[in-house]
């Protein structure tokens, strides 16, 4: 584990340092210098996101980790989480549909943990699916609330679906390998600790949909 994580941290850090050294030493000037600065900025944010995921995973698997479970209106919470993604969808030129019901849906959950679940699932689409469209819906089904995050990207091969929530697992070459391989593992563990379940369906070249189910109160 540590060997893999060390490699995944050192590689983007080395790249970041390389771009900054080129700017600092004057090897690049003018427009090229500005481009190097922008690339370095993006690499720094990528590295921050990666480290955030690492902290989440280690915290989740530590003996000190506890969830603050309380009764929460999940529809409103979901809308508040997703509204922050709308400017990013526009920036990425990603078509999107968000359909969250107006009626009150009460669930026992940890608000921060649920936010991490939603954010990781959306980020997974942006980082790995190569999708042009994302659809996020919520519905009731047999005393459960279902959150579906669906994209029309490259899909996930059938042989990979059973491993998708495993720690450090990365899919086939059709999907982007960018990332820690921990994001979906964190999602799965977080959902289970809140008494829910998560599943995935996919067809190569057509779609992938993650379905989070949590019991209604």
Residues covered by each model-derived region:
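Short helix-loop "hinge" at the ATP-lid/N-box region of the Bergerat-fold HATPase_c
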Residues: 124-126
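Short beta-strand/loop element within the Bergerat-fold HATPase_c
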Residues: 133-143
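Acidic ATP/Mg2+-coordinating residue in the GHKL
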Residues: 151
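Conserved catalytic submotifs in the C-terminal HATPase_c
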Residues: 70, 90, 95-105
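A conserved beta-strand-to-alpha-helix junction within the catalytic ATP-binding
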Residues: 68-83
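Short conserved segment of the HATPase_c
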Residues: 156-169
């Amino acid at each position: 584990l540590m060997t893999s994580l060390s490699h995944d941290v050192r590689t983007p850090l080395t790249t970041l340092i390389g771009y900054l050294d080129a700017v600092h030493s004057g090897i690049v000037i003018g427009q090229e210098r500005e481009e190097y600065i922008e690339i370095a900025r993006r690499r720094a944010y990528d590295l921050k996101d990666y480290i955030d995921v690492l902290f989440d995973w280690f915290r989740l698997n530590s003996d000190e980790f506890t969830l603050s479970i309380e009764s929460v209106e999940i529809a409103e919470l979901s809308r508040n989480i997703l509204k922050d993604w709308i400017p990013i969808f526009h920036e990425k030129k990603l078509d999107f549909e968000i359909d969250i019901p107006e009626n009150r849906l009460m669930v026992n959950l940890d608000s921060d943990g649920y936010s991490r679940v939603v954010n990781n699932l959306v980020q997974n689409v942006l980082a790995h699916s190569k999708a042009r469209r994302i659809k996020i819906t919520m519905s009731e089904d047999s005393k459960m609330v279902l959150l579906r995050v669906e994209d029309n990207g490259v899909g996930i091969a059938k042989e990979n679906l059973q491993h998708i929530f495993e720690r450090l697992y990365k899919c086939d070459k059709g999907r982007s390998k960018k990332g820690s391989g921990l994001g979906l593992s964190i999602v799965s563990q977080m959902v289970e600790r809140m008494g829910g379940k998560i599943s995935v369906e996919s067809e190569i070249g057509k779609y992938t949909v993650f379905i989070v189910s949590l019991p209604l109160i």
